[in-house]
Amino acid sequence: MNTLKEIISVANSGNAEAQNQLGDAYFDGIEIEQDYTLAFEWYLRAAQQGHKEAQYN
């Protein structure tokens, strides 16, 4: 399991799976303050790269 810090780093580098995971973390408030706006932004970044799960979040 990756730490939130690692997920943030990889997501910022453009990895769609990490972006989706970060969206999940923000949506559910896992290890970070719940923020639906940021969740949407991270899901959108992943979805724009073709990440299928993110396209439905």
Give the positions of each predicted feature.
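Short, contiguous, well-ordered secondary-structure segments
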Residues: N15, N20-Q21
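Intrinsically disordered, low-complexity repeat tracts enriched in Gly/Pro/Ser/Thr and acidic residues
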Residues: M1-N2, A11
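Generic short amphipathic/hydrophobic targeting helices enriched at N-termini
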Residues: L4-E6, D28
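Short helix-capping/linker turns of helical repeat alpha-solenoids
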Residues: N12-N15, D28-I30, D35, Q48-K52
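Hydrophobic face of amphipathic alpha-helices that form TPR/SEL1-like repeat modules
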Residues: Q21-D28, I32, Q55-N57
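Conserved hydrophobic/aromatic "anchor" residues
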Residues: Y26, W42-Y43
